């Protein structure tokens, strides 16, 4: 049985090095791996000994914490209906009637959409308080940066198509978008911002060289969106440090997307994650491979901020954006009826709330211990995310 356990854990640890896939699970035996310090010798006393003091029971560790999520499995967390203008139904421009000015409930194209890619990279300092070489209370303080990519339907990219309103009348028309642009891609990059996490880990059961342990962690960060890219044939644009409207319904202010816009705030994403895990390790001299299971719940909330396409405050050559014509029939004719009918107008998107699509995952890794004072852990996580983790620490 021991040989089988050794084989399974060693295979898992070696596999992690060749298949690097938010919060790490960590080695369940970590609280008891480093029993000596670089400044003070370890003390393996009995908690029931009346002569033992808390100074003998407590030790500190510090080190580097690196966590690299290459693909977090996420989906949107939105309502089934979305408020916007009614979809156009006329066959040609000549049949256009009044432009939509009232919102109606339509099926939300963002409902249940899966994100194509979600990445997050964190570098931090690691600090742990150890009790009786069995329990760890730890925290990390550092910086994180992220990247998100998904179908434009996940971001409710919408615009107005087939308008009868002339460019000179847009300021007072109060028109709402009527077309969902679902065949495009939206991606965003965040800045590097402060991130922190706290957690606890305990070695619950030991039998020879095997250790069964559990951990609980919480992490938080709030990066701002550094760059937003919309890759859409009908309306393609890039915004550096985008700003938008929180809690605003259509129609947006006519100045939305211009330098004169007011009432906007920076687009930022509030990241939260909870995680609980259970893992089993087996020590083989310097190496301690482990395998674990975890349950986690993550959310990315941007307050459903609505961001408008950049445009000019006043028309130049009767245009305010560089959106192309849809059918190739558009002409620039000043004050002509239907002059803007063939181009996409008042385009905007919103950053919807996202959450984990899968809650359970597995982790495999190994820890290398030197002189009972230093340790380096390498880990990979699969199923609910593809991620790699590196931790290097020493005991005082």
From Swiss-Prot:
It comes from the Bacteria. Pfam families: Chlam_OMP. Its main location: membrane. It is found in: Cell outer membrane. One of its GO terms (biological process) is monoatomic ion transport. Part of a disulfide cross-linked outer membrane complex (COMC) composed of the major outer membrane porin (MOMP), the small cysteine-rich protein (OmcA) and the large cysteine-rich periplasmic protein (OmcB). This is Major outer membrane porin, serovar A. The lineage of its organism: Bacteria, Pseudomonadati, Chlamydiota, Chlamydiia, Chlamydiales.
């Amino acid at each position: 049985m021991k040989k089988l356990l050794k084989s399974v854990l060693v295979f898992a640890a070696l596999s992690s090095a060749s298949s690097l896939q938010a919060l790490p699970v960590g080695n369940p035996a970590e609280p008891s791996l480093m029993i000596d310090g670089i400044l003070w010798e370890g003390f393996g006393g009995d908690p029931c000994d009346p002569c033992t003091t808390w100074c003998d029971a407590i030790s500190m560790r510090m080190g580097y914490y690196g966590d690299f999520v290459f693909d977090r499995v996420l989906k949107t967390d939105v309502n089934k209906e979305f408020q916007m203008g009614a979809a156009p139904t006329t066959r040609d421009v000549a049949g256009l009637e009044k432009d939509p000015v009232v919102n109606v409930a339509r099926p939300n194209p963002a409902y249940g959409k899966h994100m194509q890619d979600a990445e997050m990279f964190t570098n931090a300092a690691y600090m742990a308080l150890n009790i009786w070489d069995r329990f760890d209370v730890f925290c990390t303080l550092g910086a994180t940066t992220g990247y998100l990519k998904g179908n434009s339907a996940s971001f409710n990219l919408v615009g107005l198509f087939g308008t009868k309103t002339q460019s000179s009348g847009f300021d007072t028309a109060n028109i709402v978008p009527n077309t969902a642009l679902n065949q495009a891609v939206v991606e965003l990059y965040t800045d590097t911002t402060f991130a922190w996490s706290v957690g606890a880990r305990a070695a619950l059961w030991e039998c020879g060289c095997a250790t069964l342990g559990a951990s609980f962690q919480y992490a938080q960060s709030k990066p701002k969106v550094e760059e937003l890219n919309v890759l859409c044939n009908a309306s393609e644009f890039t915004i550096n440090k985008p700003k938008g409207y929180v809690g605003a319904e259509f129609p947006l202010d006519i100045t939305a997307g211009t330098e004169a816009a007011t009432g906007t705030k920076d687009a930022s994403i509030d990241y939260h994650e909870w995680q609980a895990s259970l893992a089993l390790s087996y020590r083989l001299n310097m190496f301690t491979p482990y395998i674990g299971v975890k349950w986690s719940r993550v959310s990315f909330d941007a307050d459903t901020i609505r961001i408008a396409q950049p445009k000019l405050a006043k028309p130049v050559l009767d245009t305010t954006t560089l959106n192309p014509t849809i059918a190739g029939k558009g002409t620039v004719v000043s004050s002509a009826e239907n002059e803007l009918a063939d181009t996409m107008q008042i385009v905007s998107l919103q950053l919807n709330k996202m959450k984990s699509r899968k809650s359970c995952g597995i982790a495999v890794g190994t820890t290398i211990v030197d002189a009972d004072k230093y340790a380096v852990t390498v880990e990979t996580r699969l199923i609910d995310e593809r991620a790699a983790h590196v931790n290097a620490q020493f005991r005082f």
